């Protein structure tokens, strides 16, 4: 673990710490349940003018197998399955990101580029040495980051070039870009990584390995653990458990979040469903 090294990170932590202290215990209000999906792993909110959808990656098989069974479903924001197989020809698609009309999807050892308007696969970028590509995050300039949970790396795709951006990131999974920084889920730890690759621990002690990360504003995060846990995480390290569905066998995989409606979308993986909740903070 690299200790806090920069004044910039220290200032960011202290300012967000004060904001986070003001938050009361958040709660969830269930809005809807969309069923009939095929092992949904990740949900991405897509808003572009009047075009508003949820993209849902569907593994439809083993998460590590090249079988051609994977696809992307398209749902309305109200939970209607608009296109159950909007794009097909994938293997085990997981994390997604959007930049300039393209949907980028992690798929075992590839980054698949899909044109959103035509719903056609345009390109497949093979990541050398990749074994289990998982989450994707894209910054405002189009730099893409993708985690590999099996090799403990975060790869970067920038200006047509791929490299290993971070190494020795235990069970690297969830990613989220916050300004110039990258938030990374590494096993049961949540880190903030600055441009100099200094790592600041935001929170630790999650009961299971981190899967999805979403910024909820004012320095707070929603963090899911695949096994069936959803946390509200404050920048001061305080964690509020919102969902524990482990005993029921209801997974909480790579979540999506709509900041306009304060809605979190939870893919339930083996239950073949997505559940939407309103996040209520007082």
Name each model feature, range by range:
Residues 73, 112-113, 155, 191-192, ...:
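WD40 beta-propeller blade core
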Residues 28-34, 80-87, 120-126, 161-167, ...:
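A short beta-strand motif characteristic of beta-propeller blades
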Residues 76-79, 115-120, 157-161, 194-198, ...:
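Short loop/turn segments that connect beta-strands within beta-propeller blades
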Residues 254-282:
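Blade-level signature of beta-propeller repeat domains, shared across WD40, Kelch, NHL, RCC1
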Residues 60-64, 151-152, 189-191, 271-273:
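Short glycine/acidic-enriched loop and turn motifs that connect beta-strands
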Residues 8-19:
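Bacterial N-terminal signal peptides
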Residues 37-51, 68-69, 87-102, 108, ...:
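Beta-rich, blade/repeat-based domains predominating
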């Amino acid at each position: 673990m690299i200790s806090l090294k920069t004044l910039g990170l220290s200032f960011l932590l202290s300012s967000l710490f004060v904001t986070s202290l003001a938050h009361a215990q958040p709660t969830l209000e269930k809005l809807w349940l969309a069923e009939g999906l095929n092992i949904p792993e990740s949900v991405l909110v897509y808003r572009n003018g009047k075009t508003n959808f949820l993209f849902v990656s569907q593994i439809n098989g083993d998460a590590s197998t090249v079988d051609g069974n994977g696809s992307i479903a398209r749902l309305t924001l109200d939970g209607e399955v608009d296109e159950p197989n909007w794009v097909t020809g994938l293997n085990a698609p997981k994390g997604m990101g959007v930049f300039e009309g393209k949907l980028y999807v992690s798929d075992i050892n590839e980054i698949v580029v899909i044109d959103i308007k035509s719903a056609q696969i345009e390109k497949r970028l093979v990541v050398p040495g990749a074994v289990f590509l998982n989450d994707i995050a894209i910054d405002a300039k189009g730099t893409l980051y993708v985690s590999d949970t099996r090799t403990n790396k975060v790869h970067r795709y920038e200006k047509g070039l791929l490299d290993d951006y971070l190494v020795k990131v235990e069970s690297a999974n969830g990613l989220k870009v916050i300004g110039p920084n990258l938030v990374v889920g590494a096993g049961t730890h949540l880190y903030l990584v600055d441009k100099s690759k200094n790592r600041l621990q935001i929170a630790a002690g999650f009961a299971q390995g981190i899967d999805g990360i979403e910024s909820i504003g004012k320095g707070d995060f929603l963090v899911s653990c695949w096994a069936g846990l959803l946390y509200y995480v404050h920048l001061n390290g305080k964690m509020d458990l919102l969902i524990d569905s482990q005993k029921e066998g209801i997974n909480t995989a790579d979540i999506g979040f709509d900041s306009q409606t304060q809605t979190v979308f939870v893919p339930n993986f083996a239950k073949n469903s997505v559940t939407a909740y309103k996040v209520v903070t007082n």
